[in-house]
Amino acid sequence: MPWDETYYPRSMRNLPPEVRRKAIEIANALLEEGYEEGKAIRIAIAKAREWAARGGAVWPR
Protein backbone atom coordinates (compact mmCIF):
# COMPACT_ATOMS: atom_id res chain seq x y z
CA MET A 1 0.00 0.00 0.00
CA PRO A 2 1.53 3.33 -0.99
CA TRP A 3 2.16 5.94 1.66
CA ASP A 4 0.78 9.48 1.72
CA GLU A 5 0.86 12.52 4.00
CA THR A 6 -1.53 10.97 6.52
CA TYR A 7 -0.28 7.36 6.35
CA TYR A 8 3.49 6.94 6.43
CA PRO A 9 6.13 4.94 8.33
CA ARG A 10 6.77 5.88 11.97
CA SER A 11 10.42 6.50 11.16
CA MET A 12 9.34 9.50 9.06
CA ARG A 13 7.27 11.01 11.88
CA ASN A 14 9.90 13.51 13.07
CA LEU A 15 10.99 14.72 9.65
CA PRO A 16 10.04 18.27 8.69
CA PRO A 17 6.89 18.20 6.52
CA GLU A 18 8.65 19.08 3.24
CA VAL A 19 11.33 16.45 3.82
CA ARG A 20 8.69 13.89 4.82
CA ARG A 21 6.74 14.54 1.60
CA LYS A 22 9.90 13.97 -0.43
CA ALA A 23 10.76 10.82 1.54
CA ILE A 24 7.26 9.46 0.93
CA GLU A 25 7.58 10.19 -2.78
CA ILE A 26 10.96 8.43 -2.97
CA ALA A 27 9.85 5.46 -0.84
CA ASN A 28 6.76 4.88 -3.00
CA ALA A 29 8.92 4.94 -6.14
CA LEU A 30 11.35 2.45 -4.61
CA LEU A 31 8.50 0.13 -3.63
CA GLU A 32 7.23 0.22 -7.21
CA GLU A 33 10.72 -0.82 -8.34
CA GLY A 34 10.51 -3.85 -6.07
CA TYR A 35 12.57 -2.76 -3.07
CA GLU A 36 11.82 -4.34 0.30
CA GLU A 37 9.83 -1.98 2.55
CA GLY A 38 12.48 -1.47 5.24
CA LYS A 39 15.22 -0.80 2.71
CA ALA A 40 12.99 1.58 0.75
CA ILE A 41 12.27 3.57 3.91
CA ARG A 42 15.95 3.86 4.88
CA ILE A 43 17.02 4.93 1.40
CA ALA A 44 14.12 7.37 1.05
CA ILE A 45 14.88 9.14 4.33
CA ALA A 46 18.57 9.46 3.48
CA LYS A 47 17.85 10.77 -0.02
CA ALA A 48 15.20 13.20 1.22
CA ARG A 49 17.66 14.60 3.77
CA GLU A 50 20.27 14.99 1.00
CA TRP A 51 17.66 16.75 -1.12
CA ALA A 52 16.89 19.15 1.72
CA ALA A 53 20.57 19.82 2.38
CA ARG A 54 21.05 20.75 -1.29
CA GLY A 55 18.37 23.40 -0.95
CA GLY A 56 15.30 21.38 -1.88
CA ALA A 57 13.60 22.38 1.35
CA VAL A 58 14.00 24.82 4.16
CA TRP A 59 15.65 22.78 6.92
CA PRO A 60 14.89 24.02 10.45
CA ARG A 61 17.94 25.30 12.31
Which residue stretches match the model-derived regions?
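C-terminal alpha-helical interaction appendages
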Residues: 1-61
